[in-house]
A protein has these predicted regions:
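Single, function-defining residue in the core of a domain
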Residues: 4-293
């Protein structure tokens, strides 16, 4: 389970906090409790500087109550059949609230993945949810003949505020890309290990690799990464150069580099042809394991 924070100074998403959870064994917990714990960590660290973005899978009354209790700013995409109260106190489904209303804002936007330009229309109003007494605002967005409903607790009274909510939600695709990378490239969709000790070791190794890859994205290593990509993962097309998916080619380049040039770990481990040093290392490791578990 991960939470990503967006830094607007460089426009990139950064990993804020990550945590493993399970429903079995001695570390068993509930998914909602783990999500609430991560939310509280982010709220304590950044307060109202962060806007928490949630997709339709998190749109529910209990989740809204947790966000209200933590006093967090949020943008949630809702299913159109969810029930809200209008400003006149009428109980209606989301699609009925904005039915027949003229859109209040129009703009041509650009798809960041394909570069396609498309028209976008917005309409907004104030609403309330049955599970929360907090004043909410819903933004109805029509893009490519599809309609989405976004709710937020930030005030939406002007066109600029409505566009801010819309573009905040659209940045979720960078976070979805990171989730897909963790599930596919790092093989975290379903680790199949029976013993808890082996599973914890595997997860620790994966997190070590993940942290190493993320550390290479630091601007201080830009020249090193560029040289590595030119050497082992060269791309000539403009689309391949401009695509915002840095971890994929970086891992491919490292894999090909280490296949051709195996890294030497003699600075950490003694050479295998020195049996005395190897036995001394094994003895020290056993002593550390005995004292520290």
């Amino acid at each position: 389970m991960e939470r990503w924070a967006d830094r607007r100074d460089d426009g990139l998403a950064h990993l804020a906090v990550t945590q493993w959870w399970t429903t079995k064994g001695v570390f068993a917990t509930k998914l909602r409790d783990s999500e609430e714990e991560l939310l509280r960590i982010c709220v304590r660290k950044w307060g109202r500087l962060l806007v928490h973005v949630f997709d339709r899978g998190y749109a529910s009354g209990p989740g809204l109550q947790v966000l209200t209790k933590c006093r967090a700013r949020f943008v949630i995409r809702w299913i159109k059949d969810h029930v809200f109260f209008t400003t006149w106190g009428e109980e209606k489904k989301l699609w009925q609230i904005g039915q027949g209303k003229k859109y209040l804002a129009h703009k041509e936007i650009r798809d960041p993945s394909s570069g396609e330009r498309m028209p976008c229309d917005l309409w907004w109003t104030a609403v309330r949810h049955p599970s929360s007494g907090e004043q909410l605002y819903v933004v109805k967005a029509r893009v490519k003949q599809g309609v989405m409903y976004l709710s937020t607790n930030d005030p939406v009274k002007t066109e600029a505020q409505a566009w801010e909510v819309f573009f905040t939600y659209r940045r979720r695709w960078q976070i979805e890309l990171s989730f897909r990378y963790a599930q596919c490239e790092l093989a975290l969709e379903c680790p199949r290990l029976w013993s808890l000790e082996a599973r914890l070791k595997l997860l620790a190794m994966v997190m070590l690799v993940y942290a190493f890859l993320l550390s290479l994205l630091d601007p201080r290593h830009h020249e090193l990464v560029e040289a590595l990509l030119r050497f082992k993962c060269h791309r000539t097309g403009m689309r391949g150069k401009q695509t915002l998916a840095p971890l994929y080619p970086l891992r491919w380049a490292l894999s090909r580099l280490w296949d051709d040039y195996r890294p030497r770990l003699t600075c950490f481990l003694p050479p295998s042809n020195d049996p005395l040093s190897v036995c001394s290392l094994i003895r020290d490791l056993e002593r550390i394991h005995k004292n520290w578990g």
